[in-house]
Amino acid sequence: MNLYLDETVELGSDGNRGNLLGIQPYMLAADYASEETFFEKIDGYLNAARQKAWLNPCTVAVLPEYLGSWLVILGEKAQAHQAKTINRAMRPIVLRNALPFIQELLSSREGNKVNASIFRMKATQMAQAYQAVFSKLAVKYGVTIVGGSILLPAPSAQGGVIKPGKGALYNVSAVFKPDGQAHPALSVKSFPIATELPFVASGLTGNLPVFETPAGRLGVLVCADSFYPQAYEQMKSLKAELIAVPSFSMGKGLWNQPWGDYSGAEAPADVDPADAGRLTEGEAWHKYALLGRIASAGVKHGVNVFLHGELWDLEAENSPSIMMNGQSWFESIATRGALLNLWL
């Protein structure tokens, strides 16, 4: 199993208070062919961290946004993961599941009925694999895992198990305890971006939870949520001590291109309108996302990781970042796989 692990970074020293472990996996579409291949890939990164003595009962491992969403091709024919584009990958899925797809399509109320119907008809299988893999990994390594995010309809965590429901699709992140159970609360993305809005519903910022972990009180802000002051106000009100930001941004070379402003919702009042087009994408993340806003929540430690890989035509080159006691740190955008360890 090739991890494409180009970078391992350690910040601080072990003070027996635990650590935030940012895992930036380099995923291939074939990694989603089965539950076993998905498990093996993520297991490889955790095993690499264990070999560096970076895992302990107070470790919180953080994985990127949409990591679980591509389980939509789970169990499908090789055409799905061998396709050159995401649209072509979806075609054999629709053909093989024609009846449930049509049923979902007829009842869909989303603007993008096709995307919504595909994810909704595969939701049970996706949720089961997501739960099984991260539960098993949390137990195997005895750590807390922020399982990136996954698209599911009306999801909930019942008895430590993630279950899809009937209703709108949400982009959610689950936190798995060292005993393998999912925390009863889910972090639901409050600010889907423009490309998500046609089929992904918005959560409420006021419902964002904080998770009790052995390393401290953890807040999880899914990608674009980290750009909005309301999210940090919620974290402050719940006395968060750590913040994790699972992210995914599409576009090769995007990080160094001019920033296109806020997407999917109005820019907050504290944003300089002139920054759109003046800042690069990377500079905007530095100024307006985790690194620029975490202090407003009274939080000193945070990590932001992005999904990298060869996933059809969904190319991404973005830089993971860490905040440690008010000091920010960026990794190179050229990195494929990376482990970023922040001792608390």
Where are the model-predicted features located?
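Active-site-proximal beta-strand elements of phosphoester/diester hydrolases
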Residues: 15-35, 62, 186-189, 216-225, ...
